[in-house]
């Protein structure tokens, strides 16, 4: 099976690509600039030479349709994050909403019956993790995409799963509003000081666990339009700092600022009746793996 991954050259895409390659899938990655992604996957997977790279714009229906030709499944990751959507909502909608419609339309055109796409824990407001009520443009765009996914199932029987990861952390997470915990791990590993720019509690989900969920979805013969909360472990930023200190007692990490605009009381749906998934990593296990990764990159090593 050949899988198209839109936006596959980024942080999460690299991890998903590795998981799919390790399971014998053919992978085609479409991204605006493939050079950074090539370097990332070369570092993480010995099968990196098997990836087919296509440069294209998710907001261009022509580019997406061309990239989807010959594929049997689509993993749609391409998009811009909260800060970019806040700074330019119209451009953000063009990429995040029209781009998602382009992915589903490409599936319809090429007879692809399943799309796994990235939604977000941001569909929930800051105080209620049970009922979607976003207070950011990014969250609003993601919620709109979930509605479109249901419409594609009703109108065209294109099945879908919208993954709602909360704060994804781990090796390689170095940009975005919620990258602070990963950057703190990197700083600790390199002997540097770092202040996480927010406080409060959030769902902390390790990137490998998220990638495994996407792989399970690609392998599954599910029907219907679904969403899954990938909440991980609810933890405060002080919990993150404590975990870092358990690995490196001398780490100079702290936190300061307002909490993230996302609820911390959502039900974790990682273990569900839809996909066969195992146990998630604990916060301490994930922090330890992240720190060890960055230690392995230090000049002394």
Question: What are the functions of these language-model segments?
Answer:
Residues 55-94:
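NAD(P)H-binding glycine-rich loop region in Rossmannoid oxidoreductase-like domains
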Residues 192, 197-200, 204-301:
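C-terminal substrate-binding subdomain of Rossmann-fold SDR/epimerase-dehydratase oxidoreductases
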Residues 25-36:
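Conserved glycine-rich Rossmann-like NAD(P)H-binding loop of the short-chain dehydrogenase/reductase
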Residues 137, 150-202, 209:
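NAD(P)-dependent short-chain dehydrogenase/reductase
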Residues 76, 98-137:
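Conserved Rossmann-fold NAD(P)-dependent oxidoreductase catalytic core, especially the SDR/UDP-sugar
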Residues 141-144:
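Active-site helix of classical SDR
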Residues 4-23:
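N-terminal Rossmann NAD(P)H-binding glycine-rich loop of SDR-like oxidoreductase domains
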